[in-house]
């Protein structure tokens, strides 16, 4: 994984990424471009792309995508966390969370990653489901318990996380989903 540029701090984003066709991929591209415009060169965004199966081959932008993992193989998550822990240039890990992106039941393959990860982590929940069954509640609560901070897109999502999942409201920030500017 190429995260060794001298005197560079990295925010590593664990997400799908273009050219994979996925709304979260587009969102991650937009947010990393905005962060890089604002903070580069002192902090740079890099992606670890989630591939949906072992035969997925995407022609990723090598300047942005530092690595990729098979989202349906739990060992990749653990190995990635260990690798990130060893890299002093990685300052924070941002996880773009959508249940369908991560392997396992309700995307629970992300949990071993978070259990091994020693870096601060920010998790953006793109979907927050109300009235969870016990399994879903356990997965989301465990993910939240390992995060340094959570981000949701609206106040209803924050309310659901607080009431239905008993997640502390002080770790949840609301950042409304924006729309990138398009030249006409």
Residue ranges and their predicted role:
Residues 54-77, 96-103:
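Acidic/glycine-enriched edge-of-secondary-structure segments
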Residues 1-67, 88, 149:
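N-terminal subdomain of nucleotide-sugar transferases
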Residues 156, 178:
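Carbohydrate-associated surface elements
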Residues 101-102, 130, 159:
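Short glycine-rich, flexible loops that bind phosphorylated cofactors or substrates
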Residues 115, 129-148:
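A conserved, positively charged/aromatic
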Residues 169-172:
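Short acidic capping loops at alpha-helix termini that bridge into adjacent secondary structure
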Residues 68-69, 82-107, 120-124:
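Short N-terminal targeting/anchoring amphipathic segment
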Residues 122, 146-155:
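A short beta-strand/loop micro-motif in the catalytic core of glycosyltransferases
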């Amino acid at each position: 994984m190429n995260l060794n540029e001298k005197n560079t701090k990295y925010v590593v984003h664990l997400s799908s990424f273009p050219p994979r066709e996925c709304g979260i991929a587009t969102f991650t591209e937009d947010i990393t471009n905005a962060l890089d415009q604002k903070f580069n060169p002192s902090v740079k965004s890099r992606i670890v792309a989630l591939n949906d199966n072992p035969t997925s081959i995407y022609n990723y932008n090598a300047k942005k995508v530092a690595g990729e993992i098979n989202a349906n193989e739990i060992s990749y998550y653990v190995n990635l966390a260990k690798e990130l822990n060893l890299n002093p240039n990685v300052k924070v890990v941002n996880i773009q969370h959508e249940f369908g992106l991560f392997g396992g039941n309700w995307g629970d393959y992300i949990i071993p990653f978070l259990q091994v990860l020693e870096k601060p982590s920010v998790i953006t929940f793109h979907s927050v489901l109300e009235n969870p069954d016990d399994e879903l509640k356990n997965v989301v609560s465990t993910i939240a318990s390992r995060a340094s901070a959570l981000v949701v897109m609206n106040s209803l999502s924050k309310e659901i996380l607080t009431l239905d999942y008993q997640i502390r409201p002080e770790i949840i920030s609301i950042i409304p989903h924006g729309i990138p500017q398009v030249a006409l």
